Design a protein with these regions (language model features):
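Conserved alpha-helical substructure of the radical SAM core
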Residues: 2-77, 81-95
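Hydrophobic residues in well-ordered beta-strands that form the structural core
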Residues: 39-41, 101-103, 166
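Short, flexible helix/strand-to-coil boundary loops that buttress conserved ligand/catalytic motifs
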Residues: 41, 142, 236
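Canonical radical SAM enzyme core domain
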Residues: 47-60, 80-120, 130-136, 143-149, ...
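Conserved C-terminal portion of the radical SAM core fold
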Residues: 68-73, 96, 100, 124-127, ...
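A polyampholytic, Gly/Pro-enriched intrinsically disordered region
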Residues: 120-126, 151, 213-223
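Short acidic, glycine/proline-rich loop/turn micro-motifs
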Residues: 137-140, 208
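Accessory C-terminal segments flanking Radical SAM cores
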Residues: 201-283
């Protein structure tokens, strides 16, 4: 497993401690998904290019990230649990830093659910998307049977001792709808502090569908995000439109050693950095 020299940790650790860049290191595990949500940032669907990030590389970079000063890990996609070894990978990552993994919550049954059992003892939370308190409105944006599968899966994970967060992505919601949604997540074993409500970001498929609010470098906080296509400014950065990955928020094509994109991001925020000769960055 790789480590970083302590001398390279300085500017990145300082930027993290000053809240100049986010303390969570993000990984896009993959881009394919069993759903095709209307507002998806990455145009994910069953038949898209998978763009899987090598699991061993994720562990190596997470170890380097810990030495650089990052304090937690985020794993997103696509649907991360379509990566066959994801439960075991989350175990490896959580040995290094606390982990949150974002999921649509529809794949937790049978053998996969059983493979999640050891993670109940780890610093791991599964953040599951649930947008509405009733099936018709929820499934309109996320797909048939999504609501049923999610409300069945959440208590199963809670029973395993796994921390669950619920993320609701909403273009709008009235007070009554929000109250009903909160009653639902409480009944599933998820407290108010673990309910995240966010707006639709107009990138990816949401841009094509005309949904949400525009978001670029001025609207998105800097959080180092690693994908198979490079390192990005934010987990909202490596979005896909018409099958092509957006590069307006690309920090570096190089992702290893992690100090390279981490220092580039810190430099962009503080105004002290410059791109290397082989870097492909936004301007």
């Amino acid at each position: 497993m790789s480590t970083e020299m302590s001398t390279t940790a300085g500017p990145v650790r300082e930027a993290i401690e000053r809240d100049a860049i986010g303390s969570r290191l993000w990984f896009y595990a993959n881009y394919h998904c069993n759903l095709a949500c209307a507002y998806c940032l990455t145009e994910s669907a069953p038949d898209v290019a998978r763009r899987v990030l090598d699991p061993d590389l994720m562990v190596e970079l997470a170890d380097q990230g810990r030495n650089l000063g990052f304090t937690s890990i985020g794993v997103t996609g696509g649907e991360p649990f379509l990566v066959p070894e994801m439960p075991e990978l989350l175990g490896r990552l959580s040995e290094l830093l606390p982990v949150v993994v974002l999921s649509n919550g529809t794949l937790f049954s049978g053998g996969r659910l059983e493979r999640m059992r050891p993670l109940g003892e780890r610093e791991l939370r599964v953040q599951i998307s649930l947008d509405r308190s009733e099936a018709v409105a929820n499934d309109e944006m996320r797909g048939p049977e999504n609501f049923r599968k999610v409300v069945e899966a959440i208590p199963k994970l809670v029973d395993l001792g796994i921390g669950v967060r619920i993320a609701s992505t909403l273009a709008w919601v009235d007070d009554d709808d929000m109250a009903t949604l909160c009653e639902l997540h409480r009944s599933l074993g998820v407290p108010d502090e673990d309910h995240v409500v966010r707006g639709v970001v107009r990138r990816g498929r949401a841009l094509t569908e005309g949904l949400g609010e525009p978001a670029g470098i001025n609207e998105l906080g800097p959080e180092l995000t690693i994908s198979a296509d490079g390192a990005f400014w934010s987990p909202f950065g490596p979005t896909v439109v018409a099958g092509r990955v957006d590069t307006d928020l690309l920090v570096s094509r190089a992702v290893s050693p992690l100090s390279r994109p981490a220092e580039a991001l810190a430099g962009l925020v503080t105004g002290s950095g410059s791109a290397g000769p082989t870097d492909d960055r936004f301007t």
